[in-house]
A protein has these predicted regions:
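Structural recognition of the beta-strand scaffold that forms the well-ordered cores
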Residues: 98-101, 118-122, 159-163, 183-186, ...
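Bacterial Sec-exported substrate-binding components of ABC uptake systems
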Residues: 21-105, 213-242, 309, 362, ...
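Short, structured coil segments at secondary-structure junctions
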Residues: 115, 136, 179-180, 267-268, ...
C-alpha cells in the first residue's frame, strides 16, 4: 500500500509539473497570423490569433492624423498566457473591468455594448452627454484634457483608451509605460467610412472578452444603414451641400473620400467641393468658400450657432448665402447638454444610420418623415 501511494504521489507531481510547463509556455509571435476578426468596413485594425492559444493580438495601423507606416500591436492575454517572446507592446488581460475613456466616443461604444459600468474615468466629464456617466459623476473621475496621472493611478485601470493627435502622444505613452498602466490607441476617427467608425466597437468588445457581443451589435448597423440608403437610390434630384464655417481665416473642407462626403452621397445629395481627393480635410481660402456658399442648396455643420441670426453675426457676408436666404441651413447640435456637451460628437460614431436618416430627412423630406435626432433647422 505504501509503495502504491508513493507511485500515485509521484504521478500527480509529474502531471502537475507538466501542466505547469504547458500553461506557462509562450506561443511565438510569428504564430499569431490567424484572422480572428477581419473588419468589413474599418481599415485601421484587425484581430489575430494562434493555434493552441486563447490570447489574441489586436493590430492597429496609423492611429493618428498624418501617421505613415505606424503599426501598433496589443496582446490580449487569456488564461494567464504570457506575451510572445520579442513582443514589446502593451499586454492587456482580457475582461478589462476598469476602463478610462479619453474620448467620449468610447463611452458611446461601451454603451452600445451594454458595458458602461466598466468606466471609471473619462476626459472632460462636463462635456459628456451620456446620462449614466452624468448620474455617476461622484464615482467616475474626470481625468481632464491632459492626463492626471496621480488620479489615474488611484483608479487602477485595466486599460486606458487613447486617441492620438500627431506626435503629442509620445509623452503620454512613455508615462503610462513607466507606470505599468496598459493602454490602447483607438483610430476610429480616421476611418473614411461611417460604418468603419462604428466597427471599432469590436475592438472594445475584444478588450472586455465579449467579441461575440460586439460583432452581434455591430452587424445590425449596416442593415439599418443600407435600408435607408436604398430609399435614395432612384432619386433624380441631388441638391448641393456646403460644410462648416471659417476658423482662423481659413475654411476647412472635408475630402471627397471622407465619411461626411459619403454620408451626403448616401443621403441623395452632392458635396459641392470636389477639389480635395486626399485622405484628410484641407483649408481653403475665404473667398473661395464665399463663392461656394453663394451656390450651395444646403449648408450644414455650421459651428455652435443655433439660429440664422447667430450665423449672420459670425460674418455679415453669410446673409448672402443661398441656404441662408432660402432657410436651408442645418446644424448638428440639436442634442446639447446644459454644460456644453454635444451628443453628436459622442454617440453618432456608433449610430451612422441615425445620422443618415437625419440627412435624408433634410434633403428629401418626402422619403423620411421622422424628426431629426442630431440636426436642428436654423430659423
Amino acid at each position: 500500500m505504501k509503495k502504491k501511494s508513493t507511485i500515485s504521489i509521484l504521478t500527480l507531481l509529474c502531471l502537475f509539473v507538466l501542466t505547469g510547463c504547458v500553461s506557462n509556455k509562450k506561443t511565438s509571435l510569428e504564430a499569431f497570423k490567424q484572422d480572428v476578426y477581419t473588419p468589413e468596413y474599418a481599415t485601421g485594425f484587425k484581430i489575430l490569433g494562434a493555434d493552441n492559444s486563447a490570447s489574441t493580438l489586436i493590430q492597429i495601423s496609423n492611429p493618428w492624423q498624418g501617421a505613415k507606416n505606424v503599426e501598433m500591436s496589443y496582446f490580449i492575454s487569456r488564461n494567464g498566457e504570457q506575451a510572445p517572446a520579442g513582443f514589446n507592446g502593451p499586454v492587456i488581460p482580457a475582461g478589462a473591468r476598469n476602463i478610462v475613456c479619453m474620448s467620449s466616443s468610447y463611452i458611446a461604444m461601451l454603451d452600445a455594448l451594454g458595458e458602461l459600468k466598466r468606466i471609471v474615468g473619462v476626459s472632460g466629464i462636463n462635456y459628456v452627454s451620456n446620462p449614466y456617466i452624468l448620474a455617476h459623476k461622484d464615482s467616475i473621475k474626470d481625468m481632464g484634457a491632459e492626463m492626471n496621472y496621480e488620479l489615474l493611478l488611484g483608479l487602477k485601470p485595466d486599460v486606458v483608451l487613447l486617441y492620438g493627435i500627431g506626435d503629442a502622444q509620445t509623452a503620454v505613452t512613455d508615462k503610462l509605460k513607466e507606470l505599468a498602466i496598459p493602454y490602447i490607441y483607438m483610430g476610429e476617427y480616421l476611418e473614411e467610412s461611417p460604418l468603419g467608425k462604428a466597427e471599432w466597437m469590436v475592438v472594445l468588445s475584444e478588450l472586455i472578452d465579449n467579441r461575440e457581443k460586439g460583432i452581434e451589435v455591430f452587424r445590425e448597423i449596416p442593415k439599418r444603414y443600407y435600408a435607408l440608403k436604398a430609399l435614395t437610390d432612384s432619386i433624380s434630384q441631388h441638391p448641393t451641400v456646403m460644410f462648416n464655417t471659417p476658423w482662423n481665416d481659413s475654411w476647412v473642407m472635408p475630402s471627397t473620400q471622407s465619411y461626411m462626403a459619403q454620408l451626403i452621397a448616401d443621403a441623395g445629395a452632392d458635396y459641392i467641393y470636389k477639389e480635395n481627393n486626399s485622405n484628410s480635410s484641407t483649408p481653403i481660402g475665404l473667398e473661395t468658400a464665399y463663392g461656394l456658399i453663394q451656390k450651395a442648396d444646403y449648408w450644414i455643420n455650421v459651428g455652435s450657432v443655433t439660429t440664422l441670426d447667430e450665423l449672420k453675426a459670425v460674418n455679415p457676408k453669410f446673409a448672402d448665402a443661398k441656404a441662408v436666404r432660402e432657410k436651408t441651413v442645418y446644424n448638428n447640435n440639436l442634442r446639447l447638454t446644459s454644460t456644453g456637451g454635444n451628443d453628436y460628437w459622442e454617440s453618432a460614431v456608433v449610430r451612422p444610420d441615425v445620422v443618415l436618416r437625419d440627412l435624408i430627412h433634410i434633403f428629401h423630406p418626402e422619403l423620411v418623415s421622422d424628426s431629426p435626432y442630431y440636426y436642428r433647422h436654423l430659423e
